[in-house]
Amino acid sequence: MASRQFVIIGLGNSANYLARHLTSLGHDIMVIDSHPEKVQDFASMVSQAVVADSTRKKQLASIPSLTKADSVIVCIGSNLEASLLTILNLKELGVKHIIAKSSSAEHTSILEKLGVTDIFHPER
């Protein structure tokens, strides 16, 4: 299997599992979160760890490799507003393949309407 580039935004338990699993498969992983301590926790297991607020399009736009990734995985489930703003920003920046974590049926419905490529529900 060829190595792919993934960006994971929102560094909680789901992101931790995904980063470890995808890294073990030989993929290139970048993580993004607004909390420096979370980013630091991930830094040793990924190729790039960035402190940025994904709800601010200008901050995402300043990360050149973001739009070159094969997939961007949004692991923000508990903060609906942050999840949706992040996805809208990614869409506006031209990210083609977005995978997003959903925390409820309503969240899933909105993600589908926004055109998210794949949706996962780790709490189910």
What residue spans do the PLM features occupy?
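Cytosolic regulatory regions of ion transport systems
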Residues: 1-124
